[in-house]
């Protein structure tokens, strides 16, 4: 059985982003990413700062750890990163979740497709906007989206500034039939941030106001990062 590089397993908690925001879930955070986003809130998955914490685990070992800390208080697991779509071996984990009647969620930037992504119940593709410093390959994004199951797929773009908002409009209009979520960016990544919740809510209100004043984003959902409103930048929640 293939082994998966794991940095964190935690929960139960709530999903803080996207279509399943508020959903009770467990988290499995994998190591490794093919992007280097300037504002990444989980850069420890790829910058080497926690390389000594990586555990190579089989699907069975991951499930056993989930059950050890979550007991029977969950039936949904979010696979996070980094970019889990780099890891072919997650196939074993997704198969095991299906066997155990556990629903799964995944977020990826859409730079890589894996066949097991077709088995994910809540699949979020989140192309990275200009503020990230990354430039998505739109042709590859088209190919990845084409191979996914449309009924389980949604798109999300994080917005920090006007350029990001224009990018979000471009993505939404390129794939108009897919559910689309705008998420306000969190530029305050220190462990302790004064008035963090109030500052994030102000940014969220500004994004909401922007969407309300245009007629070409009538079908979008505008969301905050719910977990940052509750717990700021705390890890493991």
Residue ranges and their predicted role:
Residues 1-31, 35-43, 214-215, 221:
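Flexible, acidic/Gly-rich N-terminal and inter-domain linker regions that tether
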Residues 73-75, 85-237:
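Conserved AdoMet/S-adenosylmethionine-binding subsite of the radical SAM
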């Amino acid at each position: 059985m293939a082994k998966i590089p794991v940095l964190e397993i935690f929960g139960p908690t709530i999903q803080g982003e996207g279509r399943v925001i508020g959903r009770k879930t467990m988290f499995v955070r994998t190591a490794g990413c093919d992007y280097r986003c300037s504002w990444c809130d989980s850069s420890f998955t790829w910058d080497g700062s926690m390389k000594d914490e990586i555990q190579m685990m089989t699907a069975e070992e991951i499930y056993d750890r989930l059950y050890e800390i979550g007991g029977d208080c969950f039936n949904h697991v979010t696979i996070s990163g980094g970019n889990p779509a780099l890891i072919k071996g997650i196939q074993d984990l997704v198969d095991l979740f299906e066997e155990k009647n556990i629903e799964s969620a995944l977020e990826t930037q859409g730079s890589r497709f894996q066949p097991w992504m077709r088995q994910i119940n809540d699949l979020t593709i989140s192309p990275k906007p200009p503020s990230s410093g990354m430039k998505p390959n739109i042709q590859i994004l088209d190919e990845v989206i084409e191979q996914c199951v449309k009924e389980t797929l949604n798109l999300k773009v994080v917005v920090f500034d006007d350029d990001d908002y224009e990018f979000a409009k471009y993505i939404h209009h390129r794939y108009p039939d897919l559910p689309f979520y705008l998420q306000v960016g969190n530029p305050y990544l220190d462990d302790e941030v004064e008035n963090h919740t109030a500052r994030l809510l102000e940014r969220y209100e500004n994004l909401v106001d922007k969407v309300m004043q245009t007629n070409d984003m009538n079908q979008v959902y505008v969301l905050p990062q719910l977990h940052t409103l509750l717990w700021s930048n705390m890890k493991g929640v």
